[in-house]
């Protein structure tokens, strides 16, 4: 294997926009039912001590001619709070693994066998902050696996509505739609005592063609 700088390896990790200040649901004009579902989901996720998820990630690219092209990247992630994370994304434009053990953060590219490791904070939440603020990296699903997920999702929110229910991958889900300055986002949250997210769609409002992720 070949070691190299983490910031160089991180070029294929999706970058996040600058995070503005949080606002309350009332200030943002969020419907009470939408807020209740979001709070229920984030409380459920933050209360899980250990879990694994498999997702199908989609990245939409808009060409100079205005054509939208979609790329997919299946991803798996295992979290053990407070300080363990293993995540992998493999697809058309990314082949990457991320390891965090409470002491260090490592990115590894299986295809090129390049890796990079840096010291990391002792908790997952703190590592996610450092990865973004100092390295410009965002772990898969960072908005949802942070124990402060509600606060992260509510950053710069302008409105939120409850759109009813829909079936996603065989699961009956609550459908939420939120708007912020730079993005619109939708969540489909499973009904019942285990309100896990079944689908999460982000639409950019600042990029030409409004691509979705």
How does the language model describe each region?
Residues 64, 96-100, 109, 117-119, ...:
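A short, polar/proline- and glycine-enriched secondary-structure boundary/capping micro-motif
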Residues 1-11:
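Bacterial N-terminal signal peptides that target proteins for export
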